Amino acid sequence: MAKEEAIEVEGTIIEPLPNAMFRVELDNGHKVLAHISGKMRMHFIKILPGDRVTVELSPYDLTRGRVTFRTKNTKKKK
């Protein structure tokens, strides 16, 4: 059996949870539970509430996902 392709969507971190888990609100309004990918954990990339992230969802369970990328904030600091 071939591995099914993951679905990539964007969303916003709502709240951090224990064990590197996060509640993420997707752009379409759905809320999913997501954990950090291994490379992000290895490189100590910090994720805070309000950050925009890319989440991979399995086609089998659309309520859980993996955070694969954190987009840079474009807000200017004064």
Curated annotation (Swiss-Prot):
It is found in: Cytoplasm. GO terms for cellular component: cytosol. GO terms for molecular function: ribosome binding; rRNA binding; translation initiation factor activity. Keywords: Cytoplasm, Initiation factor, Protein biosynthesis, RNA-binding, rRNA-binding. Its main location: cytoplasm. Gene3D superfamilies: Nucleic acid-binding proteins. NCBIfam families: infA. This is Translation initiation factor IF-1.
